[in-house]
């Protein structure tokens, strides 16, 4: 247990940061799943609306991953790997007919 005031404050700060990081990671996972779901939807019914839906969800996911990397929630290599996996899935989905 913390013995002085500054150590107690650091515990509070660490807990606050942990919760914010958890929120960011959760949102990244959610947007990744949404993008993959939209890809599956496009596979079943390939039309312009579904294609635009895939592209917008991809942009949102990339944006949030970049922000998480910028705030040191994710390591830059981890962010790059996540973006690469999503992008490869989307690319194969959009090119396959």
UniProtKB/Swiss-Prot annotation:
PANTHER family reported in the protein's UniProt record: 30S RIBOSOMAL PROTEIN S20, SMALL RIBOSOMAL SUBUNIT PROTEIN BS20C
Gene assigned in the entry: rpsT
SUPFAM superfamilies listed in its UniProt record: Ribosomal protein S20
HAMAP family: Ribosomal_bS20 (MF_00500)
Classification via InterPro entries: Ribosomal_bS20, Ribosomal_bS20_sf
GO CC term (a single one): small ribosomal subunit
Role this protein plays: Binds directly to 16S ribosomal RNA.
GO molecular function, one term: structural constituent of ribosome
Name assigned to this protein: Small ribosomal subunit protein bS20
Family per record: Belongs to the bacterial ribosomal protein bS20 family.
Species of the source: Prochlorococcus marinus (strain AS9601)
Pfam families: Ribosomal_S20p (PF01649)
A biological process term (GO) from this entry: translation
Keywords, sorted A to Z: Ribonucleoprotein, Ribosomal protein, RNA-binding, rRNA-binding
TM stretches of this protein: none
